[in-house]
């Protein structure tokens, strides 16, 4: 087992090894794309937790690097592999619902049990500064599978909505 530490860039040593085929990236979001690009440029396939990138430019960097290096770059969207999602997909593919014309997706995750540690976590830094859903693929991934998006069909329009924060602020208020 190898360990890499001592600097912000120590992870690059892993990517530079000759005996590694794939790099699994499960760090904070702001490092995902840069790590993925670096790993592919050093001959590694890449598996990246969501979100794989935070900007369209980073997405294109990942795509272009993957195509240039001929290395796989896979976003690991765990919500498409859950029991409910796989069961629903199978039912749709078997025709249980008839022809599927419309789907809606969402990601609801009650974090109340985690708030004491989570509130000051790096994951919340983004949410403090921005609105929107950084885990949009959790809801859209299963919906796209049912509709065969990028498997014979494509998405023309996407509507994304965001509500005000309710549970987190209410929990914090209750604790203080």
Annotate the PLM regions.
Residues 69-72, 79-176:
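Predominantly a Rossmann-like dinucleotide-binding segment in NAD(P)-dependent oxidoreductases
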Residues 1-45, 57-72:
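N-terminal glycine-/serine-/threonine-rich beta1-alpha1-beta2 phosphate-ribose binding loop
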């Amino acid at each position: 087992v190898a360990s890499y530490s001592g600097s912000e860039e120590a992870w690059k040593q892993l990517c530079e090894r000759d005996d590694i085929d794939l790099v699994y990236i499960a760090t904070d979001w702001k490092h995902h794309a840069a790590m993925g690009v670096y790993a592919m440029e050093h001959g590694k396939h890449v598996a990246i937790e969501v979100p794989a990138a935070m900007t369209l430019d980073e997405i294109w960097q990942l795509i272009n690097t993957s195509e240039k290096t001929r290395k796989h770059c896979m976003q690991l969207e765990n919500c498409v592999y859950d029991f409910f999602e796989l069961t629903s997909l199978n039912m749709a593919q078997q025709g249980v619902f008839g022809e599927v014309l419309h789907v809606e997706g969402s990601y609801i995750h009650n974090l109340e049990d985690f708030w004491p540690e989570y509130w000051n976590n790096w994951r919340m830094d983004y949410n403090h500064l921005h609105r929107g859903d950084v885990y949009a693929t959790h809801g859209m991934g299963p919906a796209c599978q049912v509709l065969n998006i990028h498997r014979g069909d494509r998405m023309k329009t996407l509507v994304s909505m965001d509500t005000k924060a309710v549970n987190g602020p209410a929990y914090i208020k209750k604790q203080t």
